[in-house]
A protein has these predicted regions:
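Surface-exposed, secretory/extracytoplasmic low-complexity segments enriched in Ser/Thr/Asn/Gly/Pro
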Residues: 1-203
Length: 203
């Protein structure tokens, strides 16, 4: 028999074969995960996700000569054709914006790293990530996942999908401020009052 993309297509027309492919994509959906929230699902019919015929199946079946159908009943031939899909990108953007992770009340802004005095010395307190989406970048991540037929995507795996802190723990100006603060704590000044001296240090 004739198999195309793992489907037994023996004695089927191109229209019938492509209908099988269409049915295969009818139930498509993608699960979207994000920082700190439960996953949500975007169904294929919400974005007009569908199989798009390229004409490859028809061309493949037309190339087979009538007598090869008889021969094909006794031996298996397997073929692979591309399965192109399409969807409405505007609707995908709308679905993204409707997700819980895109709602302001569910987002926390990132916090900058800063210098703090702890346990007798100055240290850098690292920035926090937050969960505020960068909608443009998040859409690109989601769009690429849908275009490649993935059934799940996690924005947390792509830091660029989120708004990042302006000042990170590796910021050069912050490192310099830390060094200056710790130099201050190590400095000492000695005052002389007649025969008495008093030393003041950063502590």
């Amino acid at each position: 028999g004739t198999w195309i993309n793992g489907v037994n297509c023996s004695q089927m027309t191109a229209y019938e074969v492509e209908n099988l492919f269409r049915q295969k994509f009818q139930d498509y959906s993608i699960e979207v995960s994000s920082r700190g929230l439960d996953p949500q699902t975007i169904a294929g019919d919400q974005i007009d996700y569908q199989y798009l015929s390229t004409g490859e199946v028809l061309k493949l079946l037309q190339q087979q000569k009538p007598y090869e159908w008889i021969k094909g009943m006794y031996e298996q031939k397997s073929y692979t054709v591309s399965e192109n899909t399409g969807y409405n990108k505007t609707k995908l953007q709308e679905q993204l914006k409707s997700l819980n992770c895109a709602q302001a009340e569910n987002q926390t802004a990132p916090e900058n790293a800063y210098v703090a005095f702890q346990d007798g010395q100055f240290v850098i307190v690292p920035e926090t990530e937050g969960s505020k989406l960068n909608i443009k970048q998040a859409y690109q991540v989601l769009d690429a996942a849908v275009e490649s037929g993935q059934t799940s995507v996690n924005f947390a795996d792509t830091p660029e999908a989120y708004v990042s802190a302006d000042v990170t723990q590796n910021d050069q100006a912050l490192q310099s401020a830390l060094e200056a603060c710790n130099n201050y704590t190590r400095a000492s000044i000695t005052y002389t009052f007649g025969d008495r001296t008093e030393t003041l240090d950063g502590n």
